[in-house]
Structures are given as structure tokens and as C-alpha cells.
């Protein structure tokens, strides 16, 4: 885990350094990103990653607590990754649609996903179905979010850096921390809390979409 975190930090540093080098060769782009003005958008994107805190940090522990074998949790993880890869290869046609609508669909699908994990923690059929939703809640959401920010803001490089830092950085850290506290106090309701957070992300993005009609 520490190696993966360190490697991610190194890669992120290289990407940011290269992006700065490229930006210096281009004309300066005026910053048109206003976090407070678009707070519903950024809150929704961040809450989505907060909801993943339970999954990334406690899914295996949660399932084995309910009697699912460790080998089966490995199969579940692997199936989710396969679904993610399939979506990444076939998402082009989906991204041609309204990106903000896709963000709403994927956050709502994530709320359903986490609720099903909470409601049926031992049902393997349901669990494999929830892992198939990883194609939506991670792969399609991530690509739609990047594309939406790219088309929304003129300062595209800064928008992507905010997305990585705020959404994945702050959101991921907060989600892991919150999941740890919830698991200590209410372990059974861990994924119910994730479902509620993902639903709040959906509501926030929905409100943002209504404002931008």
C-alpha cells in the first residue's frame, strides 16, 4: 500500500511538472475556475470519491466479516477490474451524450451499488452485480468528469489539477478517514453510509445541472 501510494505521488509529480512545462510554452490562459460559484459541481464530484472510502479500504474486511471467503473477495475484486477495463475500451459512444447527465447516472448507480452491498453482504449473485457497476461508478464517472471539466473551463490544465487534488486527494482521504470511524462504531452500516454519501453526490450534481439549464 505504501509503495502504491509513493508510486502514485511520483507519477502525479511528473505529470504536473510536465504540464507546467507545456503551459509555459503556450499563451497564458485566464483562470475561469470559480470553486465557490460552481460549488455544487465540485461538491458532487468530491462526495463521489468520499463514498468510495468504504470500498477501497474495507470491502474485503467487511465481506469476510459476513463469512465470504478471502478467495471469493479476490474474485469479486478481479471481476470489478475486468468490468472497468471493458468500459474504458467501449465508453466512447457513451461520452458522446450529455456528460452532466452521465455524471448523475453514475453517482445514482453508485448509491444503489453501495446500498446493495449493505443489504446483501453474503449474496454472491448480488455482490457480483454490484462489482459490474464498477464500470459505471469508476470508469465512466472518471472519464465523464474529466471530459466535462475539459469542456467547461478554458483553463483545462488547472481544472484537471483541481480534480485530482480536491476530488481524489481530499475526497479519497476524507472517505478513508470517515470509513474508519464508521467501521469502528457502526460496522454493519458502513456501506449504508456510502450509499447516502453517493446519493448526496447525485443530488448535488442534479442541482448543478438545473442551475446550468
What are these regions (language model features)?
Residues 17-47:
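Juxtamembrane intracellular "pre-TM" segments in multi-pass secondary transporters
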Residues 37-76, 142-143:
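Helix-loop boundary and gating motifs at the non-cytosolic
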Residues 46, 125-140:
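Hydrophobic core of transmembrane alpha-helices in multi-pass small-molecule transporters
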Residues 101-116, 195:
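Structural signature of the two symmetry-related core transmembrane helices
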Residues 86-99, 183:
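Helix-to-loop junctions at the C-terminal end of transmembrane segments
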Residues 1-6, 180-200:
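A membrane-interface helix-boundary motif in multi-pass transporters
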Residues 139-154:
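Intracellular juxtamembrane helix-capping segments at the cytosolic ends
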Residues 156-186:
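A late C-terminal transmembrane helix in Major Facilitator Superfamily
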Amino acid at each position: 500500500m505504501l509503495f502504491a501510494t509513493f508510486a502514485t505521488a511520483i507519477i502525479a509529480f511528473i505529470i504536473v511538472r510536465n504540464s507546467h512545462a507545456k503551459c509555459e510554452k503556450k499563451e497564458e490562459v485566464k483562470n475561469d475556475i470559480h470553486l465557490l460559484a460552481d460549488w455544487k459541481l465540485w461538491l458532487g464530484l468530491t462526495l463521489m470519491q468520499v463514498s468510495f472510502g468504504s470500498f477501497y479500504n474495507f470491502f474485503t474486511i467487511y465481506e469476510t466479516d459476513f463469512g465470504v471467503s478471502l478467495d471469493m473477495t479476490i474474485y469479486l475484486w478481479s471481476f470489478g477490474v475486468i468490468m472497468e477495463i471493458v468500459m474504458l475500451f467501449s465508453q466512447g459512444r457513451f461520452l458522446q451524450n450529455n456528460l452532466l447527465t452521465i455524471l448523475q447516472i453514475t453517482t445514482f448507480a453508485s448509491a444503489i451499488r453501495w446500498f446493495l452491498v449493505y443489504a446483501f453482504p453474503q449474496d454472491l449473485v448480488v455482490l457480483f452485480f454490484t462489482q459490474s457497476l464498477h464500470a459505471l461508478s469508476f470508469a465512466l464517472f472518471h472519464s465523464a468528469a474529466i471530459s466535462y471539466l475539459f469542456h467547461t473551463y478554458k483553463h483545462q490544465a488547472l481544472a484537471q489539477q483541481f480534480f485530482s487534488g480536491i476530488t481524489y486527494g481530499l475526497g479519497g482521504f476524507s472517505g478513508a478517514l470517515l470509513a474508519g470511524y464508521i467501521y469502528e462504531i457502526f460496522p454493519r452500516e458502513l456501506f449504508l453510509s456510502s450509499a447516502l454519501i453517493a446519493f448526496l453526490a447525485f443530488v448535488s450534481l442534479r442541482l448543478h445541472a438545473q442551475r446550468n439549464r
